[in-house]
Amino acid sequence: MEVTSQSTLPPGFRFHPTDEELIVYYLRNQTMSKPCPVSIIPEVDIYKFDPWQLPEKTEFGENEWYFFSPRERKYPNGVRPNRAAVSGYWKATGTDKAIHSGSSNVGVKKALVFYKGRPPKGIKTDWIMHEYRLHDSRKASTKRNGSMRLDEWVLCRIYKKRGASKLLNEQEGFMDEVLMEDETKVVVNEAERRTEEEIMMMTSMKLPRTCSLAHLLEMDYMGPVSHIDNFSQFDHLHQPDSESSWFGDLQFNQDEILNHHRQAMFKF
C-alpha cells in the first residue's frame, strides 16, 4: 500500500483512531484489499527490525507509529506467533481485550513489551506495542503450501513509554511553578496587610478633637500628673499667701497646669 506523505495531509491533521475504528476501517479493509480512509499506515514486517528502527520506516507519526505487519508461526505446525526480533523479543503482558462495534465482537487487542536479549533473561525496555487482529483471524489461519505465515495482516501501534525520571522532572517543574506563584501571593498579601496596619496606626495617632481629663492623664506623651515633679516653672501663675491655703492653692495650680497643657496639645 502506498503511504501518503505528510506534506499532502490537511493542515492540523491528527491520526488518533479508536480501537474500533482501527479494526473496522483499517485492518478489515487491509485484509480485504480495500482502500483505507487515509493511506498513512505502511506495510512493514516489524519483527525484522528493532522497535527504535521502526519510526524511520514510516513518514507519519511523532510519538506513536502504526504498521500493517504479517505474523509468522513459531513452529511449523503450531498457531503461536514468532515474537523474536533482531536484538530481542516482544513479550505479551496482561490479557487480550475484545474490541466491539455495537454488539458485535470485531477484533482483539493485545499489549506487548519489548525485551533486549534472549528469553528468559531479557532486559525490559520502554517500547510498547498494541497488536490488533480480526476476531475471526485464527479460524482463517490455515497452513497453505508449507507456508509459515500465521496471519496475513495485523495492525500494530508502537510507541515508547515516557521514562519515570522524565515524568518526575516535569512534575517537579510544575510544582516549582506552583510554589513560586504561591510565594508571590504571600509576599503581596503581606505587603497589603502591612499597608493596612500602617494606615490603621497613622489613623489611631490622630488626636481627638475633644478629650476628657481622664483621657489626657493617660496619654503617653503627657504622663500622669504625679510625674510632674517640678512646679517651680509655674510659680508665676499663683503665689500662696500662707501655709493654711497651700493645699487648696496647689489644687488650683494643678488645674491651671492641665489647662495650659491642654491648650498646648490642641494647637495643630
From Swiss-Prot:
GO BP term, pick one: multidimensional cell growth
Tissue: Expressed in senescing leaves, petals and sepals.
Annotated Pfam families: NAM
GO molecular function: DNA-binding transcription factor activity; transcription cis-regulatory region binding
Keywords: Activator, DNA-binding, Nucleus, Transcription, Transcription regulation
Recorded superkingdom: Eukaryota
Knocked-out gene: effects: No visible phenotype, but delayed leaf senescence. No visible phenotype under normal growth conditions, but mutant leaves show a stay-green phenotype and deficiency in chlorophyll degradation during extended darkness.
Induction trigger: Induced by the heterodimer APETALA3 (AP3)/PISTILLATA (PI). Induced by senescence. Induced by abscisic acid (ABA). Induced by ethylene.
InterPro entries the record matches: NAC-dom, NAC_dom_sf
DNA-binding feature ranges: 106-167
Main location per the UniProt record: nucleus
One Gene Ontology term, aspect cellular component: nucleus
Location relative to the cell: Nucleus
Domain NAC: 9-161
Protein role: Transcription activator that binds to, and transactivates the promoter of the abscisic aldehyde oxidase AAO3. Promotes chlorophyll degradation in leaves by enhancing transcription of AAO3, which leads to increased levels of the senescence-inducing hormone abscisic acid (ABA). Involved in the control of dehydration in senescing leaves. Binds to the DNA sequence 5'-CACGTAAGT-3' of SAG113 promoter. SAG113 acts as a negative regulator of ABA signaling for stomatal closure in leaves, and controls water loss during leaf senescence. Transcription factor of the NAC family involved in senescence.
UniProt free text on domains: The NAC domain includes a DNA-binding domain and a dimerization domain.
Additional free-text comment from the UniProt record: Plants silencing NAC029 produce abnormally shaped seeds.
Name of the protein in its database record: NAC transcription factor 29
Organism: Arabidopsis thaliana (Mouse-ear cress)
